[in-house]
Amino acid sequence: MSHNPQAPVLYELCDRLGFLVMDEVSDEWEFPKRKWVQGWNVGTPSYDGTFDFFEEWIERDVTDMVRRDRNHTCIFLWSIGNEVDYPNDPYSHPVLDGAKINQPMFGGYKPDAPDAMRIGTIAKRLAACVRAVDTSRP
């Protein structure tokens, strides 16, 4: 499964059928993703999502998801986020200039953009939330 926790009945079905599930809390963190409601790259994207509530709710959301789903045998992995910097690539870091790995249309390092090191800082914080509730899975 991806992007958000699913209904409990789906995990029960996966338990019975022997499916393996990666339980994922969210697909965006601090910044919105483009939501193409008319098709990929068609029309004007929407940016509605959970990013507005990220800082206030993410630790509780992660903890609640793990507590709710930890007894399901189908779950083999907790996911704290999926493509959290995609497709908008809001973060930047000086290493991008020298490595020439940033997307060409953005032109390398953007000093006014949020530091890419934030991704690791947030990930460590959310991983700690998971481990506080369940140490049996990665």
Can you describe what each PLM-predicted range is?
Residues 1-138:
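Active-site mouth of glycoside hydrolases
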